[in-house]
Amino acid sequence: MSGNTGERPFADIITSIRYWVIHSITIPSLFIAGWLFVSTGLAYDVFGSPRPNEYFTESRQEVPLITGRFNSLEQVDEFTRSF
């Protein structure tokens, strides 16, 4: 036999006007905030990932693949010097 936790049933919550008043504002706000975070380029700055125009430089147009097993550190250093 299960006990009562005292919480409202989920069906009561999602059918209440208060739920939809709150969430009709917060859900679009979160979407707009995420879109602005990505479209302004702040996401690239925060996470340190290169912007789409920085993947390939003028001096290096090939894909930076690590091909050697024993000289991988030198290859990584060579790739990072071009940034």
UniProtKB/Swiss-Prot annotation:
Subcellular compartments: Plastid, Chloroplast thylakoid membrane
Residues annotated as transmembrane: 21-35
Protein's UniProt keywords contain Ribonucleoprotein: no
Cofactor note: With its partner (PsbF) binds heme. PSII binds additional chlorophylls, carotenoids and specific lipids.
GO biological process: photosynthetic electron transport chain
Keyword Protein biosynthesis: no
Membrane topology, as annotated: Single-pass membrane protein
Primary site of residence: plastid
Keywords of this entry: Chloroplast, Electron transport, Heme, Iron, Membrane, Metal-binding, Photosynthesis, Photosystem II, Plastid, Thylakoid, Transmembrane, Transmembrane helix, Transport
Residues binding heme, per UniProt: 23
Summary of subunit composition and partner proteins: Heterodimer of an alpha subunit and a beta subunit. PSII is composed of 1 copy each of membrane proteins PsbA, PsbB, PsbC, PsbD, PsbE, PsbF, PsbH, PsbI, PsbJ, PsbK, PsbL, PsbM, PsbT, PsbX, PsbY, PsbZ, Psb30/Ycf12, at least 3 peripheral proteins of the oxygen-evolving complex and a large number of cofactors. It forms dimeric complexes.
Entry's family note: Belongs to the PsbE/PsbF family.
Function: This b-type cytochrome is tightly associated with the reaction center of photosystem II (PSII). PSII is a light-driven water:plastoquinone oxidoreductase that uses light energy to abstract electrons from H(2)O, generating O(2) and a proton gradient subsequently used for ATP formation. It consists of a core antenna complex that captures photons, and an electron transfer chain that converts photonic excitation into a charge separation.
Name listed for the protein in its UniProt record: Cytochrome b559 subunit alpha
Source species of the chain: Physcomitrium patens (Spreading-leaved earth moss)
UniProt lineage: Eukaryota, Viridiplantae, Streptophyta, Embryophyta, Bryophyta
Gene it is expressed from: psbE
